[in-house]
């Protein structure tokens, strides 16, 4: 029931992003609406087929062999077999920042990437918990969902940026937005898109925590990993570069130095304390 509700909520939020594109596009007249829809469809298709390549390239990840990482291969193979799913490709990112992510459009085309930092930071039990979380993202099609959400939000930003090029002093009779419409587009469009995208991202992280812990049968292992990652990502954050920001929402922990106040409210990840509390509660129910 919980997963069905979560899936429905995600579908509604994605529908909200798509509707927002159409509403903003309609301010530019029929031509603007057509362009907005075509751009949305094209961006979705591109995100669907290339999300894995884009994320792995952003992290400069390389394929890793079983000879290089036998323990990693063993735990991924065991969990994939237990879930009756194909084994994903495995990659290592050459960065000290501790993190991991999964990417790919479906289980047969998925990849799991661990940074060198997370391999050193976590023990085998904790790393197994992280792998369970990432595999759950794959099995729940969260990579596709987050890629589509990010693509739709990018389209909205494209339309907002385009709005700056439109003269605002004309009337609505010439099939263009008036001053009030332009202000609404530029002020409310990005905010609404961001709020919806964050709601999707946080919802999927909670679900991956729960289903990943269920897959490994060890919620406390993931809770322990999250504690270490919370401290580790603060000490060794990724630099805030555009190429890395495109992949940040896929990672198990916020890879950048945490902000304060409003910036913290707009994080792509749920609060670590809340995630850990949910896992500990889940472990209590299993006892």
UniProtKB/Swiss-Prot annotation:
Record localization: Cell membrane
Any Gene Ontology CC annotation: plasma membrane
Gene name linked to the record: htpX2
Record: active site: 134
Biological classification of the source: Bacteria, Bacillati, Actinomycetota, Actinomycetes, Kitasatosporales
Mode of membrane association: Multi-pass membrane protein
Pfam families per record: Peptidase_M48
Protein species of origin: Streptomyces coelicolor (strain ATCC BAA-471 / A3(2) / M145)
Single GO term (MF): zinc ion binding
The UniProt record lists the keyword Cell membrane: yes
Keywords: Cell membrane, Hydrolase, Membrane, Metal-binding, Metalloprotease, Protease, Transmembrane, Transmembrane helix, Zinc
Family matches, as InterPro entries: HtpX_protease (IPR050083), Pept_M48_protease_HtpX (IPR022919), Peptidase_M48 (IPR001915)
Name this protein carries in UniProt: Protease HtpX homolog 2
EC number, as in UniProt: 3.4.24.-
NCBIfam families to which the protein is assigned, alphabetical: PRK03072.1
Positions annotated to bind Zn(2+): 133, 137, 205
Cofactor(s) listed: Zn(2+)
Cofactor binding comment, as recorded: Binds 1 zinc ion per subunit.
Entry similarity comment: Belongs to the peptidase M48B family.
Xref: Gene3D superfamilies: Metalloproteases ('zincins'), catalytic domain
GO BP annotations listed: proteolysis
Sequence intervals crossing the membrane: 7-29, 33-50, 148-168, 180-200
Domain of life: Bacteria
């Amino acid at each position: 029931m919980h997963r069905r509700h979560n899936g429905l909520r995600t579908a509604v939020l994605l529908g909200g992003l798509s509707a927002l594109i159409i509403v903003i596009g309609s301010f530019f007249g029929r031509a603007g609406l057509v362009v907005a829809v075509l751009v949305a469809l094209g961006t979705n298709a591109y995100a669907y087929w290339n999300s894995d390549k884009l994320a792995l390239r952003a992290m400069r990840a390389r394929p890793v062999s079983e000879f290089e990482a036998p323990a990693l291969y063993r735990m991924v193979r065991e969990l994939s077999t237990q879930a009756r799913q194909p084994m994903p490709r495995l990659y290592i990112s050459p960065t000290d920042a501790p993190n991991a992510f999964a990417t790919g459009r479906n289980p047969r085309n998925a990849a799991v990437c661990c940074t060198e930092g997370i391999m050193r930071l976590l023990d085998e039990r904790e790393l197994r918990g992280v792998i369970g979380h990432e595999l759950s993202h794959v099995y729940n099609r969260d990579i596709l969902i987050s890629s589509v959400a990010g693509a739709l939000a990018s389209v909205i930003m494209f339309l907002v940026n385009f709005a700056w090029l439109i003269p605002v002093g004309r009337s609505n009779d010439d099939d263009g937005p008036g001053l009030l419409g332009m202000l609404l587009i530029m002020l409310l469009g990005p905010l609404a898109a961001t709020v919806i995208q964050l709601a999707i991202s946080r919802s999927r992280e909670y679900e991956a925590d729960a289903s990943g812990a269920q897959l490994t049968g060890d919620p406390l292992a993931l809770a322990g990993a999250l504690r270490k990652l919370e401290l580790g990502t603060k000490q060794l954050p990724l630099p805030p570069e555009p190429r890395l920001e495109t992949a940040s929402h896929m990672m198990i922990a916020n890879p950048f130095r945490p902000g304060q106040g409003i910036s913290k409210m707009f994080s792509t990840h749920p609060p670590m304390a809340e995630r850990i509390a949910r896992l500990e509660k889940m472990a209590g129910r299993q006892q």
